[in-house]
Amino acid sequence: MTISRADLQIASSAEPKTHGNLNESFAPEIRQTASTIASLSIFGTPSDQECQPIPVVPRSSSSDELRVWRVTSAGLVEVDAKTMGAFLDKPKTDKTNVHGEGNGIRYGMSSMQGWRICMEDSHIAEAIMSQSSPYKDWSFFAVFDGHAGHHIANRASSQLLEHLISSEEFREMTKTLEENNGVLTDSTLKLLEKGIKKGFLSFDEISKTSNDISKSGCTAVCAIVTPTHFIIGNLGDSRAVVAGKNEIFGTEDHKPYLEKERKRIEGAGGSVMIQRINGSLAVSRAFGDYEYKDDPRLPADQQLVSPEPDVYIRERNLENDQFMVVACDGIYDVMTNEELAEFVKDRLSVHSDLREVCDDVLDECLVKGSRDNMTMVVVCFPAAPEVNIHRKEAEEAWVSRVKTVINQFLDEAVAAEDFKQEEDMVTLKSILDKVTANGLLPTDLRVPEHTVTTLAQKILTQRDIKHV
C-alpha cells in the first residue's frame, strides 16, 4: 500500500482524556490509525523499497491538547495545531467595501475576516474589464479563497486576469471579434472557454516558482459578463450564483468525494478519507497546494489537486436576469443558493447601496454560524429588484427605536455603582433580552436575524464597552 507525497493529517491526543469531542473511547482508535499509517511505505510500492516504520518526530508540549501529525518524507511530524485553521476568541467584523458601475451594471463588494486568525481572501471587481476592445464592453469579477496562507490568493487577484487576456485563445478571439463587430459565436465562445482553462493552468504553473507562495493554496471563481453572455470559471468550492425572476443557476463545487474528482485523485495515487484528499485537503481543485502536484509523470490536470477550472457559458436574458453573486464558501457553508438568492432579493428592496446588501449577507452568515473568512460580490443587472420606499422607511424607523433601547440599557448599566468600565462586561444576551422585553422584535417586518446583534455590537464598540 502506498501514500502519495501529499501530506496526511492525523489527529492524536496527548492522553486519553476528554478534548471537546475527543474522548477515552475514541483516542485508542486514533492511536491505532497512526500506528497503521506508520507501517506504510511513503513513496513507491513494496516492490520499489522495503516497508519500514515511519519515524515519529514529536513537538514538545507540556499541556493536554489536540495534537496534529502529518505524514512527510521525514516521518510522522507533529505540527502546531494553533496555525492550522485556528480561530479567534471573538470574530473580527470590520469590513472592507468597494462598489462601482459601468456597462449597464452595478456592483458592491464586502469582505470580513470573521473568526479566522488571518484574512486569506482576495478579489477582483472590474465593471470595465479593460480599456481595449472588446473588453471595454465586458466586466470581470472574481473571488479567491486562500488556505494555509494568503499568498497565492493575493497573487491571483493581481495577475490572473492578465494571464487570461494574454492567452493565445483570447488573442485569436479578440481578432475575430474585431472582424464581426463583437458578436460572440459558437467558435469564439469555445476560444473563450479554452482561454480561461489555459490561463488558469498558466497562472498556476508560473506561480510555482514564486518564493512567497510557500504551501498556500486558493480556490477561484471568476465571471466575465459580456452584453450577451455570462462566462464563469470555477476552481474549488467558491461559487457563482445567477438569480433570475424565475430560476437560479449555480456553479458546482469541486469536492474530493465527487465521483469525477475521486477517480482523478485515486488515479494519481491518492485516496479520499473523511471526504478529504488523503484525509487533509477539503477541495480537489485549487491554485497552489504544490505538494499535491509533484508527480512528474502526470500533467497538471491529472494531479491530486487540479488547477483546471470548469467553465460555464450562459446566454444573458435582460428581462429575467436580476443579479449575480460571486462569493467564497464562508457564505455557502450556511446558506444554500436558493436561500442566498432570496435573502439578496429581500435586501435589495431596502438598500440601494450594494455594499450594504453584501454587509447584511456577511452579518447574517456570521449569526448563522459561519466560522470562515467571508468575501462576496453582488452584481445587479437592469431587471434587479428596486427599493421599496415604504419598506425601507419602516425598517429604518424600527432600527432607530432599537438603537434607543440599547443605548438606554447601556446608560443604566454603566451608571450602576458596581460597574467598572475596565473590568465588567455587558453580554449581548442581556441586550437581546432587553429588546425582546420592549416588544421590539419585528413581527410585521422581514428584518434579518442578525440585525439586533449587529446593532448591539456596533454600539458597544462605539462606546468602548467590553462585551461577550
Curated annotation (Swiss-Prot):
Disulfide bonds: none annotated. Mn(2+) 2 binds at D145, D329, D372. It catalyses: O-phospho-L-seryl-[protein] + H2O = L-seryl-[protein] + phosphate; O-phospho-L-threonyl-[protein] + H2O = L-threonyl-[protein] + phosphate. Probable phosphatase which regulates axon termination in ALM and PLM neurons, and synaptic branch extension and/or stabilization in PLM neurons. Plays a role in synapse formation in GABAergic DD motor neurons probably by dephosphorylating pmk-3 thereby negatively regulating a MAP kinase pathway that includes dlk-1, mkk-4 and pmk-3. Residues 1-23 are annotated as: Disordered. GO terms for cellular component: cytosol; nucleus; synapse. The keyword Thylakoid does not apply. Keywords: Hydrolase, Magnesium, Manganese, Metal-binding, Protein phosphatase, Synapse. This is Protein phosphatase ppm-1.A. It holds the Pfam family PP2C. Residues 106-381 form the PPM-type phosphatase domain. It is found in: Synapse. Expressed in neurons of the nerve ring and motor neurons of the ventral nerve cord.
